A protein has these predicted regions:
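Beta-propeller-forming repeat regions
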Residues: 19-310
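Sec-dependent N-terminal signal peptides of Gram-positive bacterial secreted proteins and lipoproteins
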Residues: 2-23
């Protein structure tokens, strides 16, 4: 009887208190706090531009926020790059990327661009032309292996877009030729026409754009990538180690590097002549890694136990 009375009194207290059980609904608990300071001003600019909108978040890479702060004009202070889709009655709208800068103490929209892709695949920052500040590379995805990319440069108060003509499955920004400026390495697999290739794009002053300076064929048996790592080779060259998945739950490793003597990409493990291919095929599940922490990536290889037939 005493226990029942205590339970009844506790229930009555909860019912009468300001923090009622009904106030603890999921929506209230998950509502984010209001932005303050610069973030509030940036949010205001987005709302003025978009009206009703939904943020879009990059799917891969180091930058996964819908609003990314980064210095893209070399003035020593960060600008904002944001992604959203406008909410429309039919639910159909392009992704918008908006560039926001603080001018004379006020955050303002500088430019906005639309893309019909389904997702923002990734965002990268790199000084690709040697002007001393970073360009913005945005990858766009339509849920296939053929991603597209656009490079944006913010200079003289204007944002200039440049769509790259090549699609990619994965990419890396690295100084492959050791000239102090990053190059863009792009590789792709196309299961429809059974093609695979890697290419290196480098800034050209003549065209004021990224141009393809070298291209090499890769293993057409690969259907998708399991791992993609840029790293150092034992000879000091820079390359990309790619673990690719083949049919039958098999995996192989491809290496593509920039050869400074030949001034082109090399793929030493691949040959169009099947008799000259170096086989690194193994059961899927184990990818390349720097096992001994010497700065050089090691490649796994499968071999039968001693006494077993190969």
């Amino acid at each position: 009887m005493r226990t029942k009375l205590i339970c009844a009194l506790l229930a009555l207290c909860l019912f009468c208190s300001g923090c009622s059980v009904m106030d603890l609904d999921t929506q209230n608990l998950m509502s984010p706090p209001k932005a303050t300071g610069d973030k509030a001003d940036i949010q205001r600019v987005i709302e003025e531009s978009a009206g009703s909108y939904t943020f879009k978040y990059p799917q891969k890479g180091d930058y996964r926020s819908a609003v990314i702060m980064h210095d893209i004009n070399g003035d020593g202070t960060d600008e904002a790059v944001a992604f959203y889709k406008s909410n429309t009655p039919d639910g159909v709208s392009d992704i918008t990327v908006i560039f926001i800068d603080q001018i004379s103490g006020e955050w303002q929209r500088i430019a906005a661009f639309q893309n019909s892709a389904a997702e923002v695949e990734r965002v990268c920052f790199s000084d690709l032309n040697g002007d001393g500040w970073d360009s913005v590379l945005i990858g766009w995805s339509n849920y296939s292996s053929a991603n597209q990319a656009t490079v944006f440069r913010y200079e003289n108060g204007e944002v200039k877009p440049s769509d790259l003509e090549y699609s990619y499955t994965d990419l890396a920004l690295e100084d492959f030729d050791r000239d102090g400026t990053d190059e863009l390495f792009m590789s792709s697999v196309n299961t429809a026409d059974k093609s695979a290739a890697a290419r290196l794009l480098k800034y050209s002053e003549a065209s004021d754009s990224l141009v393809n300076v070298s291209e090499v064929e890769m293993n057409q048996e690969v259907t998708q990538y399991a791992s993609f790592q840029a790293g150092e080779l034992e000879n000091g060259y820079r390359g990309v180690y790619i673990d690719g998945v083949k049919s039958g739950n098999q995996m192989t490793t491809e290496l593509v590097y920039w050869d400074p003597e030949e001034q082109k990409l090399q793929a030493p493990f691949y040959s169009s002549d099947s008799s000259n291919k170096i086989s690194l095929t193994r059961p899927a599940g184990v990818t390349c890694m720097d096992i001994n922490e010497d700065g050089v990536i090691e490649i796994p290889a499968a071999r039968p136990f001693e006494g077993n037939a190969a």
